């Protein structure tokens, strides 16, 4: 009778160890899942932050940290910004390296070479 109880206890202990070891092996996967879930939650909450500051403004109308910031640009800065935007629109370097080098025939065993 005692032998049967010992065998059952050892079987349950082995089963518990097997379950616990599988849980520990999948722990990095759970960390990755939780990190992705947190990133999605932060990304989803991003547009609502302006609404939060609006609510705070109703409670604390004189708080300087909640006032909208006005940024003054020098007269020539707007023209410079427009020129930079025009340059960035037509810039072929915005493409990934593989697409830029689509016609490249040189191939090195570690990857594509610059042509």
Swiss-Prot record:
Somatostatin inhibits the release of somatotropin. Residues 1-18 form the signal peptide. GO terms for biological process: regulation of cell migration. Residues 19-87 form a propeptide. It is found in: Secreted. Keywords: Cleavage on pair of basic residues, Disulfide bond, Hormone, Secreted, Signal. GO terms for molecular function: hormone activity. Pfam families: Somatostatin. Belongs to the somatostatin family. InterPro entries: Somatostatin, Somatostatin/Cortistatin_C. One of its GO terms (cellular component) is extracellular space. This is Somatostatin-2. It comes from the Eukaryota. Disulfide bonds join 104-115.
């Amino acid at each position: 009778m005692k032998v049967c109880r010992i065998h059952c206890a050892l079987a349950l202990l082995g089963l518990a160890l097997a379950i616990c070891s599988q849980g520990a092996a999948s722990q990095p996967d759970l960390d990755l899942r939780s990190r992705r879930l947190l990133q999605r939650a932060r990304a989803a909450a991003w547009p609502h932050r302006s609404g939060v500051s609006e609510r705070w403004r109703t409670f604390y109308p004189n708080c300087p940290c909640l006032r909208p910031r006005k940024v003054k640009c020098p007269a020539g800065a707007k023209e410079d910004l427009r020129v930079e935007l025009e340059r960035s629109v037509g810039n072929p370097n915005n493409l990934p390296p593989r697409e830029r080098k689509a016609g490249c025939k040189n191939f090195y065993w570690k990857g594509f070479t610059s042509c």
